C-alpha cells in the first residue's frame, strides 16, 4: 500500500512538473497575448472601434510575435538567453512552414533549440583555445539555430501543422455535438491537483488562439478560467462551513473572484474531496450555458478574474459570459451546500484536514510536524524566504505579501519573495509551498528548509515561523 501511494505521488509530481513546464512558456508572455486580444477586440471589423489600419496588426502579431515569444521563453527555460535565442530562431522555421499560428510548434522547437545548444556548450567546455571563445559561441549558436530552422521548416512545421489542424477539427466536432461541457469532468479535478495552468495555458490556450484567429473568439478560453465553480464552493463554506474554513471564506472569495487567484479555493475542496462533484457540476453547467449563448473570448484571460473575463469579452458576448459564470456559481453553490449541510463532522476545519487530505491524495503526511522538519533544522541565519507556486504569480505572491507584513510588524528584516517552483533561487534559505507542491520544491532545492502549508491565505505556520526566527 505504501509503495503504491509513493508511486501515485511520484506520478503526480511528474505530471505537475511537465504541466508547469508547458505553462511556463505561456505565462511570462500573457501580457503580449492580452495586448493582441485588446487590439483584436477593438479594431477588427466586428470590434468595438473598427479600424482597417490598426486591424493590420492582428495577423502579424498572432503569426509571428506570439509564437516567437513562446519559442524564446521555452529555450530560455532550458539555457538562459543563449538558449532563448536559438529557440526563437528555430521557431521561425515552423512559423514559415505552416499556414496557421504555430503555438504548438513553438512549444516544441523553443525548448529543443535551448537543449541542443546547451549540450553543444557542455561538449566543448574547456576545449576552445583562448581568444576564440566569442567566435565559437556566436557561430555555434548561428549554425545550430540555422540547421534547426531548416529542419523545422521542411519537417517539423508540416507535421505539427497537421496535428494542430486535427486537434482543431476535433474541438470543432466536439463543440458541434454539444459535448464540450463534458470536458469539465476532467478539467475541474485537474485544477485541484494544481494542473490548472498546464490545462489552460498548455492545452486550451494554443487551441483557443487558433480558433479565435479564424472566428474572432473562442469558447476554449472560458473552460478553465471560469471563476463560477470556485465562487459557489466558497460561498457555501461562508454560509454553511465551520471553524477556520468559514472565517477565511469571505477573504478567499475576494481573492478568487476579483483577484483571479483560483488556487485559493483548492484547499477547501481538498479538505472535503466530495466537493469536487460541486466543482464539476458548476463547470459543466457553466460551459453548457456558454455553448447555448455561443459565448467566447478574444484571448486568454489571466488571471481568471471576472474583470479579466469581461476585458477579453468581444462585443455582443457579455450576456453569455456573465450568464455562464452565474449559472456555474449557482450550481456549484447548491451542490456544495448539500454536502456541507449533510456532513457528519461539521466541526472539521481547514487547519485540521491536512492528514486526511494527504491520505486521499496518495502521499505520506508530513505537514503535522513540518516546522520540526525531521530531516533538517531551520538555518541559524535566515536571509531569504521564498514562496513558490506553479506559476509564481498568484498564490505565492499572496502568501509572500502576508508573511512580509507579519515580518515587518515583528521587526524582522528578512527578504520575502515569490517565484515559480521551477525557478527557485539557489540562495533561498526557507522555501514555503502548498503541501501538494512540496515534493517538487525539495527536488529542485534540497538544501533549503522547506515548509508546507495548506492555505496560503491563512496558515498558522507563518506565526510559528516568526516565533522560531525571533529566537
From Swiss-Prot:
Its EC number is 2.7.1.197. Residues 52-55, 162-170, 299-318 are extracellular. CDD domains: PTS_IIB_mannitol (cd05567). GO terms for cellular component: plasma membrane. The modification Phosphocysteine is found at residue 389. GO terms for molecular function: kinase activity; protein-N(PI)-phosphohistidine-mannitol phosphotransferase system transmembrane transporter activity; protein-phosphocysteine-sugar phosphotransferase activity. Residues 1-29, 77-139, 192-278, 341-471 are cytoplasmic. It is a multi-pass membrane protein. Keywords: Cell membrane, Kinase, Membrane, Phosphoprotein, Phosphotransferase system, Sugar transport, Transferase, Transmembrane, Transmembrane helix, Transport. It is found in: Cell membrane. One of its GO terms (biological process) is phosphoenolpyruvate-dependent sugar phosphotransferase system. Optimum pH is around 6. InterPro entries: PTS_EIIB-like_sf, PTS_EIIB_2, PTS_EIIB_2/3, PTS_EIIB_mannitol, PTS_EIIC, PTS_EIIC_2, PTS_IIC_mtl, Sugar_PTS. Gene3D superfamilies: 3.40.50.2300. The keyword Transferase applies. Optimum temperature is 85 degrees Celsius. It catalyses: D-mannitol(out) + N(pros)-phospho-L-histidyl-[protein] = D-mannitol 1-phosphate(in) + L-histidyl-[protein]. Pfam families: PTS_EIIC (PF02378), PTS_IIB (PF02302). Residues 18-342 form the PTS EIIC type-2 domain. The chain crosses the membrane at residues 30-51, 56-76, 140-161, 171-191, 279-298, 319-340. Homodimer. NCBIfam families: mtlA, PRK15083.1. The EIIC type-2 domain forms the PTS system translocation channel and contains the specific substrate-binding site. The PTS EIIB type-2 domain is phosphorylated by phospho-EIIA on a cysteinyl residue. Then, it transfers the phosphoryl group to the sugar substrate concomitantly with the sugar uptake processed by the PTS EIIC type-2 domain. The phosphoenolpyruvate-dependent sugar phosphotransferase system (sugar PTS), a major carbohydrate active transport system, catalyzes the phosphorylation of incoming sugar substrates concomitantly with their translocation across the cell membrane. The enzyme II CmtAB PTS system is involved in D-mannitol transport. This is PTS system mannitol-specific EIICB component.
Amino acid at each position: 500500500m505504501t509503495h503504491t501511494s509513493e508511486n501515485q505521488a511520484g506520478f503526480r509530481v511528474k505530471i505537475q512538473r511537465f504541466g508547469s513546464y508547458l505553462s511556463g512558456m505561456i505565462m511570462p508572455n500573457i501580457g503580449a497575448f492580452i495586448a493582441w486580444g485588446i487590439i483584436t477586440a477593438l479594431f477588427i471589423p466586428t470590434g468595438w472601434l473598427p479600424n482597417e489600419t490598426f486591424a493590420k496588426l492582428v495577423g502579424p502579431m498572432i503569426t509571428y510575435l506570439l509564437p516567437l515569444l513562446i519559442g524564446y521563453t521555452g529555450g530560455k527555460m532550458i539555457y538562459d538567453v543563449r538558449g532563448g535565442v536559438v529557440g526563437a530562431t528555430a521557431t521561425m522555421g515552423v512559423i514559415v512552414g505552416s499556414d496557421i499560428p504555430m503555438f504548438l510548434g513553438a512549444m516544441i522547437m523553443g525548448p529543443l533549440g535551448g537543449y541542443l545548444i546547451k549540450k553543444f556548450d557542455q561538449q566543448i567546455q574547456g576545449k576552445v583555445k583562448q581568444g576564440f571563445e566569442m567566435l565559437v559561441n556566436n557561430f555555434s549558436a548561428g549554425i545550430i539555430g540555422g540547421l534547426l530552422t531548416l529542419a523545422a521548416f521542411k519537417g517539423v512545421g508540416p507535421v505539427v501543422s497537421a496535428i494542430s489542424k486535427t486537434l482543431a477539427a476535433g474541438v470543432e466536432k466536439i463543440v458541434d455535438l454539444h459535448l464540450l461541457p463534458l470536458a469539465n469532468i476532467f478539467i475541474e479535478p485537474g485544477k485541484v491537483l494544481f494542473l490548472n495552468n498546464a490545462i489552460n495555458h498548455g492545452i486550451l490556450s494554443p487551441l483557443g488562439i487558433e480558433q479565435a484567429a479564424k472566428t474572432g473568439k473562442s469558447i476554449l478560453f472560458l473552460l478553465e478560467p471560469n471563476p463560477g465553480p470556485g465562487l459557489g464552493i466558497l460561498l457555501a463554506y461562508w454560509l454553511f462551513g465551520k471553524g477556520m474554513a468559514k472565517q477565511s471564506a469571505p477573504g478567499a472569495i475576494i481573492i478568487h473572484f476579483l483577484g483571479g487567484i483560483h488556487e485559493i479555493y483548492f484547499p477547501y475542496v481538498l479538505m472535503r474531496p466530495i466537493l469536487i462533484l460541486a466543482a464539476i457540476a458548476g463547470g459543466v453547467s457553466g460551459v453548457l450555458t456558454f455553448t447555448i449563448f455561443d459565448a467566447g473570448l478574444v484571448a486568454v484571460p489571466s488571471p481568471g478574474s471576472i474583470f479579466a473575463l469581461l476585458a477579453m469579452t468581444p462585443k455582443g458576448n457579455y450576456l453569455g459570459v456573465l450568464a455562464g459564470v452565474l449559472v456555474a456559481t449557482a450550481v456549484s453553490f447548491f451542490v456544495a451546500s448539500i454536502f456541507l449541510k449533510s456532513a457528519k463532522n461539521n466541526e472539521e476545519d481547514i487547519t485540521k484536514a491536512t492528514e486526511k487530505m494527504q491520505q486521499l491524495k496518495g502521499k505520506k503526511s508530513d505537514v503535522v510536524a513540518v516546522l520540526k522538519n525531521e530531516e533538517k533544522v531551520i538555518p541559524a541565519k535566515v536571509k531569504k524566504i521564498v514562496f513558490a507556486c506553479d506559476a509564481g504569480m498568484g498564490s505565492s505572491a499572496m502568501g509572500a505579501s502576508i508573511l512580509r507584513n507579519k515580518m515587518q510588524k515583528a521587526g524582522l528584516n528578512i527578504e520575502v519573495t515569490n517565484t515559480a517552483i521551477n525557478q527557485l533561487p539557489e540562495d533561498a534559505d526557507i522555501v514555503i509551498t502548498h503541501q501538494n507542491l512540496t515534493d517538487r520544491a525539495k527536488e529542485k532545492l534540497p538544501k533549503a528548509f522547506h515548509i508546507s502549508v495548506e492555505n496560503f491565505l491563512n496558515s498558522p505556520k507563518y506565526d510559528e515561523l516568526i516565533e522560531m526566527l525571533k529566537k
